[in-house]
Amino acid sequence: MAELAHQQSKRKRELDAEEAEASSTEGEEAGVGNGTSAPVRLPFSGFRVKKVLRESARDKIIFLHGKVNEASGDGDGEDAVVILEKTPFQVDQVAQLLKGSPELQLQFSNDVYSTYHLFPPRQLSDVKTTVVYPATEKHLQKYLRQDLHLVRETGSDYRNVTLPHLESQSLSIQWVYNILDKKAEADRIVFENPDPSDGFVLIPDLKWNQQQLDDLYLIAICHRRGIKSLRDLTAEHLPLLRNILREGQEAILRRYQVAADRLRVYLHYLPSYYHLHVHFTALGFEAPGAGVERAHLLAEVIDNLEQDPEHYQRRTLTFALRADDPLLALLQEAQRS
């Protein structure tokens, strides 16, 4: 169970420094971690806060670095990251709450306006908790707030700088293969096209609790291995991309009654992990990583490849990198020379 919780934390997609990542946000047991399992305990004992890595009053989220499993309290324990996030409201439960007599404390009153602190019952007071344990220095840096810098990556930059840098990193995506091979999260799969070349699985993103549709968020993960990102796509991949767009939209309509014109379907560049995947989010949801500097609408990707099969090998792409990302310095140096 501890291993499962650790692996799922690694893939929290878009809690990655935006994105898993994300993710974001890998498992060895199918059917665990989907909100239906029995109550469990955290996979460690104790949690001594060492540092607040990041917090956002707007997003109601905080990232904490702590020491756990300490024997003496002298720093001999292990590192862990705990992410606490207030969950979205569920309209039906809130309506029931307001019909009753909720516990209130008056904070302010003036004419027709008044402000209270309301203390909700247990079913409305849950806090989504993501655990990264044991946490490495890379995890700590990933969640630490950093300044961002825009870079423009040419096709040559990708081939000569970005790709060699990625290939030099130990970026495990075993958790992706576990999903595709049904070794983990098999009961969470909403739809599958099993074709090994042009098929995919559609699965709810871990950032979505599946309790309401306002923040609907699913991920399509292609079965075909070796496609790292947008940069690898050519006309050869058009059947796969068309399948993901059409069949993904149809599956979401069947399961959640959300029509295609109410969905935002896009790829990230840079992605939070390097196995081709596509994001499906509710159009009105301000999903992490949906900004113009990172999101590429799938329909437009298809159009671009239809007109120029090597569009993404040639095109200059703009994206943001954290100040501490080694790739930023590599690209800046290459562009100066």
Curated annotation (Swiss-Prot):
Q: What protein family does this chain belong to?
A: Belongs to the HIT family.
* The reaction(s) this protein catalyses: a 5'-end (N(7)-methyl 5'-triphosphoguanosine)-ribonucleoside in mRNA + H2O = N(7)-methyl-GMP + a 5'-end diphospho-ribonucleoside in mRNA + 2 H(+)
Q: Which residues carry this modification: N6-acetyllysine?
A: 138, 142
Any idea what job this protein has?
Decapping scavenger enzyme that catalyzes the cleavage of a residual cap structure following the degradation of mRNAs by 3'->5' exosome-mediated mRNA decay pathway. Hydrolyzes cap analog structures like 7-methylguanosine nucleoside triphosphate (m7GpppG) with up to 10 nucleotide substrates (small capped oligoribonucleotides) and specifically releases 5'-phosphorylated RNA fragments and 7-methylguanosine monophosphate (m7GMP). Cleaves cap analog structures like tri-methyl guanosine nucleoside triphosphate (m3(2,2,7)GpppG) with very poor efficiency.
Show the domain comment: The C-terminal histidine triad (HIT) motif and the N-terminal domain are required for the decapping activity. The N-terminus is necessary but not sufficient for binding cap structures.
Main localization category? cytoplasm
Question: Known PANTHER family for this protein?
Answer: HISTIDINE TRIAD HIT PROTEIN MEMBER (PTHR12978), M7GPPPX DIPHOSPHATASE (PTHR12978:SF0)
How the protein assembles, per its UniProt entry?
A: Homodimer. Associates with components of the exosome multienzyme ribonuclease complex, such as EXOSC3 and EXOSC4. Interacts with NDOR1.
The listed location of motif Histidine triad motif is 275-279
One cellular component term from this protein's GO annotations in UniProt: P-body
Residues carrying Phosphoserine: 24, 101
N-acetylalanine found at: 2
Q: Provide the protein name.
A: m7GpppX diphosphatase
For substrate, which residues are the binding ones? Answer: 175, 185, 205, 207, 268-279
Cellular compartments annotated: Cytoplasm; Nucleus
Question: Which residues are catalytic?
Answer: 277
